Amino acid sequence: MTIRVVIADDQAMVREGLRLILDLQNDIKVVAEAADGHAALRAVAEHRPDVVLMDIRMPGMDGLQATERLLRGGRPGPRVLVLTTFGEDEYLYAAMRAGASGFLLKDSPRAALLHAVRTVADGSALLDPALTRRLLEEWVRRPPSRAGVPEQLRALSPRELEVFAGLARGRSNAEIAADLVLSDTTVKSHAAHILAKLDLRDRIQAVVLGYESGLVRPGG
């Protein structure tokens, strides 16, 4: 299967560099480029890509607005991989809320870019470790929630709630399996059921819900 990609970035040099890297792969094909959010929406409508590489800061409609439009209401759409820099932390949380499936620093090495594209195309979520730390620092500064387990999570069984807590901490299936003394297959099955029950697109949205609800706290 070939992964169809749209590149949305207002800098032509960045788009050209990304295309050169991606088009060298047998399983990835760049089907369109866009210089702003409006052009990205048109390219997605025309080419139906699997993944959109989305810059945040673009003229006219920015990448955050474009992501919200693409994924509004949780409807099916391409997986959005946000390209960001260390100066754009304030946008990351909003992009997570909008439904982006992955976040990658623009200065990441070639191998990390290819891994990220393949990971989100496969239906998984990806968050650069450096960005994870910065997001957790932001959550630390927020006042803790005192609402208890939200109604949305009450649909989960006790075991599913344990697995969800692991997902919300960003732990892998293998790590959750070791924590709960379960098989990887069982954890994978629980994770799929949890995302479906909670109407979440992927694990990144599970992280958002876990921290927003106060079920998981940084360092907890």
Q: Where are the predicted features?
A:
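Active-site residues of response regulator receiver
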Residues: 9, 55, 84
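Conserved sequence signature across two-component system core domains
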Residues: 8-9, 34, 52
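Recognition helix of helix-turn-helix DNA-binding domains
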Residues: 170-205
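Acidic catalytic/metal-coordinating carboxylates
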Residues: 36-39, 59-68
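Active-site beta3 strand of CheY-like receiver
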Residues: 47-53
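The feature encodes the CheY-like receiver
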Residues: 14, 54, 59-62
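Short hydrophobic/Thr-rich beta-strand motif most characteristic of the beta2 strand and flanking loop
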Residues: 27-35, 43, 200
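Short, flexible helix-to-coil linker/hinge segments that flank and couple to helix-turn-helix
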Residues: 92-97, 102, 107-158, 162, ...
